[in-house]
Amino acid sequence: MLFNKEEYKQRLKKVQKMMQDKGIELLISHDTNNLNYLTGYDAWSFYYAQCAIVHVNAEEPLCFVRAQDAGGAYIKSYLKKENVIVYDENYIHTWPRHPYDYLVEIIKERKWDKLSIGLEMDSHYFTAFCYEKIKQGLPNATLKDSDRLVNWTRLVKSETEIGYMKSAALISEVGMKKAMEVINPG
């Protein structure tokens, strides 16, 4: 992990505070950058259903991934094993079955199905079909757009994040100086 567990916990607290301010009790974050920001998970498997699920009072988010990606989630995230929720490959390309059928089951099992649920309605990989699965599966929930809640949280950088950004800038500077020394016309 690039960041320590405390960094992720601080991020979670900031997100939960914004959730409270917006009246969101459960957040389903589909944006791959936000999934990484909240959990540390960074696999390139965003082309199929995966998300972070944040309860407003939880100590950790949940990381919802397909079975073939579970190993990466266990290794790359800071989460306890029980907070990595793995759905079976039988949910992949078996129309009309969909991974969000299982997501809905998880939400119901945890008795979160009557909460105010924030969804990233403008996330690239949150399709209309995903939305319909949640809407139909959780008829007693109040669904609302989270208005890029996590994205807005990410704007204010921690000292650790700023440190990484400064290091990256220095590396870029050294690389560009070297490029300028060796570059020639033609």
Locate each region found by the language model.
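A composition/biophysics-driven feature that prefers long, compositionally simple stretches
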Residues: 1-174
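C-terminal helix-coil-helix/basic helical segment that borders enzyme active sites and/or dimer interfaces
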Residues: 177-186
